[in-house]
Amino acid sequence: GAQLNVLSLTSEENMMTGEITNEQKRIDLPQMTEPVKNIFVDPRQQWLYVINGRAQADVFSLRDKSLNGRYKLLENGDAEITASTQLVGGISLIFGDSKGGLAQWFMARDPDGESRLKQIRTFQMGTTPIVEITAEERRKGFIALDASGKLGVFHSTAHRTLLVDQVVEGQGIFGLSPRANRVIVEAGGKIQPLLLENPHPEVSWSALWSKVWYENYDEPKYVWQSTAANTDFEPKLSLAPLTFGTLKAAFYAMLLAAPLAVAAAIYTAYFMAPGMRRKV
């Protein structure tokens, strides 16, 4: 097995003298029983994700210096994790397996209030192993390449498979531009540039009208929040709260307006002076 050690470096600057003090802390974690394939750390440095070859993720709490849990990533015992990455923001993990499947996982609280790694949504690209996954730098989208040379474009929040196309023959590697509008694929010693037009992948029927499980939420919800100050923001475009709010406002307005209109009509017809009624 492998021994994991986490080294934390902290720098503090004295406001009066400008002197910088460096502090180093070492966190010893339990020894791993399986070979480690990948390691991820969330931006807040709270969780350490260790992916091993048995399609299992060990999650460690860096604050408590303890094991949060061991999570089975695949139900199929014959499959294994072949590729993995973090989405922009570092909260979600995307795993690709040997059967062509992809899954999004992130930490969420269970009914007991404990944080657990949970599978949020899945995608199916084909039947051949996923060899590489790259996340977009500005949106909650990602691109995957399988062993047969198929390229897939996905968006996590909208739960959309935007494109699956054969771009090369056989296994290759690829690179994605910062704006996610160009892809370069290398296979068999040849480089193939591709132009990707993907203007609004975050919009889908489920994103607009269904409950969506957003990052940092404990369950799927209807939420509208179209913008934020940070660049790794996850758009929340549910029209359900807007529609319900509009209908509710109209209903309460009619409760007040309808009796006033009926009372005004009765007064005009039976009690208003004839001269005034002609002017009205």
Task: Give the residues covered by each predicted segment.
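Alpha-solenoid helical-repeat scaffolds
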Residues: G1-N5, M32-V41, Q46-G53
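Long, low-complexity, acidic Ser/Pro- and Gly-enriched intrinsically disordered regions
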Residues: A2-Q3, E12-N14, W47-Q56, S98-G101
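WD40-repeat beta-propellers
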Residues: L4-T10, A57-L62, L102-A108, L145, ...
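Beta-strand-enriched, solvent-exposed domains that form extended recognition/catalytic surfaces
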Residues: S98-Q104, R116-V131, D146-S148, G152-H155
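Transmembrane-helix boundary motif in ABC transporter permease subunits
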Residues: A253-V280
